[in-house]
Amino acid sequence: MRLIIIGAVAAGTSAAAKARRNDEALEIVIYEKDTYISYSGCGMPYYLGGEVDAAEELTPRDPAFFKSKYNVDIHTQHEVVSINPELKILEVKDLVTDTVFTDHYDRLILATGASSVIPPIKGVNSENVFTLRNINDMNRIKNYIDQQKPKKAAIIGTGFIGLEVCENLKRLGIDVTLIERLPQVTPGLDQDMALYVLDHLQKNGIKVYLGASATEITGNSVILSDGTTIEAEFILFSTGVRPNITLAKQAGIEIGTTGAIKVDHSMKTNLSDIYACGDCIEHYHVVTGKPVYRPLGSTANKTGRIAGDCITGGTLSFRGILGTGIFRVFELTVAQTGLSEREAKEQDYEVAVCHNIKPNKPEYLGGKEMVIKAIADRQTGRLLGVQIVGYEGVDKRIDVFVTAVSFGAKVEDLFHLDLAYAPPFSTTKDPVMYTGMILDNAIHHGRDLMTAEELDQLMKSGENYVLIDARAASQFDNAHIETAGNIPHSKLRSAVGELDPEVIAVTYCNKGVTGNAAQNILINNGVKKVYNLSGGHKHYSKLDKFNN
């Protein structure tokens, strides 16, 4: 049997390797239109900034390696230009000789990947305008920086790649400006969490323009939709990718609602003996069960392995994704998984939201705070999604949350996890456990939370309420929320009789713990509706800083 794979980066080579492990007699051929194969695309920003010493470290395998180890024939600079699914014939163009020939397959895998989206604006074809999608892109950028030595750069788009390149250009001493058409950076995050990223960028000397689109590139400048001109000798578009589906559409392969190739759990398309995997396919979301398009290298490798297994008689089955992502920008780690608050509400979940600010380990051993935002279904208690920003231990916590969401855990389950503890590694109540405690109290034990946005709405509503700052008087005097009164936690029991039990009460402290203690006192003394401010004054002041 002859298996042909179109594409030799993450998914295609993963499919080939798994197919060979399952079947030694199978003939495996891969056509790849690029010159590089099986490379680490996610490492490219770090080569540009010098963290990766040599480009060869990102391209450790060549066609000779796959021939020797897996007996797979990889033909680079060969583009498949058409598929005849009835005759099982491909037309292939040799990009070096410009000749076209045909090849026959018994089984076919499309691993055609995705391409950078570039807005159709004037000047995008200028020599100083780049995208970063493959090794050739990376080499062009590196050569340009080495030769032209730009002093100013503009990056259009603030997704993972854009921010990673931003950091690495800044390390080279280049002045960087970020341009984002949305009103926040990192569009995958909720806006309140994105503000932590924005604040960190600005503290590291990055200029950020939000709600602004590039409309024209003229020489060494970018013109924005409001007429602002940004000087930049180097310009990078990091405005997302779209799946490469031209071949699939021409062959009659079904395209899903997300615009990517529709596949089943074994990576089969609607056409007999044709499979697809990697960044060209749509996935489905573990929480909602609905189609999503989230191209990631980890998912590409996974779906490639599944395709290679199923095409050779295996039983691997795709179980969906959560859209888990993580990146670093100037020592800050940002991670997310599952549904954001915005996405959960769009799916009509009644959500409970908490902001848990805790160190990754005891402060006496140098622990550093992280902010964990967790979203749960108020009706069932199921954990729906988590976002984290912090300096240490973020990767460890997000992976625990990923596991929990993947297996349908409820918030109370987090408290019962037997997580590893010793002071060099964690606190006695790990931030994961504490997140579960907060949400369990909110959903099942009447300790309701109020987000900063909800408090702002309450303050503007005209409804009668009392806002209690339960911190010490010195902390209150230093900074407090505008309409708050100060009743320190130590004095609240004696003062509770002066409060109207029918009036909404909102408590807060610095991060939430003492606010919760104050909430308990009020509830246990008959105040009927009491909320604790999620994330306390520390989180509220972050939002207030940017809103004002």
Where are these regions (language model features)?
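A Rossmann-like FAD-binding core segment of flavoenzymes
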Residues: 25-27, 75-96, 103, 170-263, ...
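Rossmann-like dinucleotide-binding cores of NAD(P)H-dependent redox enzymes
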Residues: 59, 152-154, 160-216, 295-299, ...
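Short hydrophobic core segments
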Residues: 104-113, 232-240, 304, 381
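Glycine-rich dinucleotide-binding loop and its adjacent helix/turn
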Residues: 110-172, 207, 263-265, 487-491, ...
